[in-house]
Amino acid sequence: MLILASASQARRNLLEQLSIKYAVMVSHIDEGKYNSQNVKELVQALSFAKTESVVSEYIFNCRKENKALAILGCDSLFEFDGEILGKPRNKSEAICRLEKFSSKSGILHTGHCLMYRQNLNNKVIGKSFDGIICDVVSTRINFSELSNVEITKYVETGEPINCAGGFAIDGKGAVFIKSIEGCYSNVIGLSLPWLRYALNKAGMSLWK
């Protein structure tokens, strides 16, 4: 069974799309403690911290079926003109960002961390996981020209406030995106091709 260390509904939707059996345990880390001018280093550190936080809390019954178990943590940030952007703090900031994005491009980076084990001999997974697989997947996003009216109406829906960068490719914000270069699901918050790769490397499979 896979444990998702995230409260993100978008990431849950991606796992459900694959009919993966999973549970959710929300990590409780202070993201403000993590600072780096390198966006890839930052998303990787955050995804690792989220995974490690859940691993340390997850205690299971060793008498359960002896199946591989993995914990997955992710974190996404948007890089635009040298700035690292998380979720907008308010509607005004969301509007300001989208005005800047008009007819330009940025890169959505998602850090992924999978901690896994292939036996359940110990009750505390944090003391006996078999391996860690971490990586960052990046997708370039090219925006269409956006009018002020469109931007204001979009922000009024509330959708941008919940998204890294301030837009959702799997929601109403999709109409603003001219094209992408790279993994689509990565922009949503979890690269499914990366997940397949990581699970295979961990000796697990999407098809079991």
Curated annotation (Swiss-Prot):
- Broadest EC class assigned to this enzyme: hydrolase
Which reactions are catalysed by this chain?
a ribonucleoside 5'-triphosphate + H2O = a ribonucleoside 5'-phosphate + diphosphate + H(+); a 2'-deoxyribonucleoside 5'-triphosphate + H2O = a 2'-deoxyribonucleoside 5'-phosphate + diphosphate + H(+)
> Per its UniProt record, what Pfam families does this chain match?
Maf (PF02545)
Name the UniProt key words of this record, in alphabetical order. Answer: Cytoplasm, Hydrolase, Nucleotide metabolism
Name the cofactor(s).
a divalent metal cation
Q: Give me any GO biological process, just one.
A: nucleotide metabolic process
Q: What is its main location?
A: cytoplasm
Question: What residue range is the signal peptide?
Answer: none
Got a GO cellular component term for this one?
cytoplasm
What the entry lists under HAMAP family is as follows: Maf
Its protein name is Nucleoside triphosphate pyrophosphatase
Q: What is the lineage of its organism?
A: Bacteria, Bacillati, Cyanobacteriota, Cyanophyceae, Synechococcales
- Name the gene: maf
